[in-house]
A protein has these predicted regions:
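Short, low-complexity N-terminal intrinsically disordered segments enriched in polar/charged residues
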Residues: 1-43
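Short beta-strand edge/turn micro-motifs at domain boundaries
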Residues: 2, 96-100, 118-119
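A solvent-exposed, acidic/Ser-Thr-rich amphipathic alpha-helical stretch
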Residues: 34-105
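Short, surface-exposed coil-to-beta transition loops
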Residues: 83-85, 116-119
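Short, cysteine-centered beta-strand-loop-beta hairpins and adjacent loop/turn segments enriched
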Residues: 106-116
């Protein structure tokens, strides 16, 4: 079975640009760059998140750049974050593209102020 196909130079450039977009998103998330993160999305964006591997239903389905602000701002509640990007599937059709990217996100929380010991 052959999975390779010929890509035009333009489609190759488009796919690389989308992959760089995914990586820039993760970088800006880990730097707590809310303004920079939001700038990566169009006003009519759709942002779908699946956190439960056992479900086909999204955990979040947000529409529009403004809906992303509280989600991205919530990263400030963590001591540190690290986003590791995995595979991406990208479909390019002219000037429109859709895609699915896998990411492992680590969110570190400092519980020292709320931790209690049990006798």
């Amino acid at each position: 079975m052959t999975l390779s196909r010929t890509l035009s130079p333009q489609e190759s450039a488009d796919r690389l640009a989308i992959r760089e977009l995914v990586d820039t998103y993760a970088h800006r998330a880990d730097r707590r760059d809310l303004t920079g993160q939001l700038a990566l999305f169009t006003a009519d964006t759709r942002f779908v998140v699946y956190m439960d591997a056992a479900s086909t239903e999204p955990t979040q389905d947000l529409r529009g750049r403004d809906a992303l602000m509280p989600v991205f701002d919530d990263l400030n509640s963590y001591t540190a974050t690290t986003h590791l990007n995995g595979q991406s599937r990208i479909a390019v059709d002219g000037d429109h593209a859709t895609g699915e990217s896998y990411r492992l996100a680590h969110h570190l929380v400092d519980w020292t102020e709320t931790r209690t010991t049990t006798p």
